[in-house]
Amino acid sequence: INVPLTRHKSMRESLREKGIELPYQDPAIKYRPEFATANYMYINQYADTIYYGAISIGTP
């Protein structure tokens, strides 16, 4: 399955243009320091997301 992606400004970039800075600290690292050395990539960092794709499941 191929999902066409479109590029947008990330939420972090949009807020930076307005003079608002978001911290880069991952909450998992704050409460579980052992995660800082793990080789995982978290997909829940929406502030840095710049590609979006529309997905529909089933028929309406």
Swiss-Prot record:
Highest taxon in the source lineage: Eukaryota
Keywords in UniProt for this one? Aspartyl protease, Hydrolase, Protease, Zymogen
Report the Pfam families cross-referenced here.
A1_Propeptide
What is a biological process (GO) this protein takes part in?
proteolysis
Q: What is its EC number?
A: 3.4.23.-
Propeptide residue ranges? Answer: 1-35
Q: Name one GO molecular function term.
A: aspartic-type endopeptidase activity
Record Gene3D superfamilies: 6.10.140.60
Q: Which family does it belong to?
A: Belongs to the peptidase A1 family.
Which named protein is this?
Answer: Pepsin-3
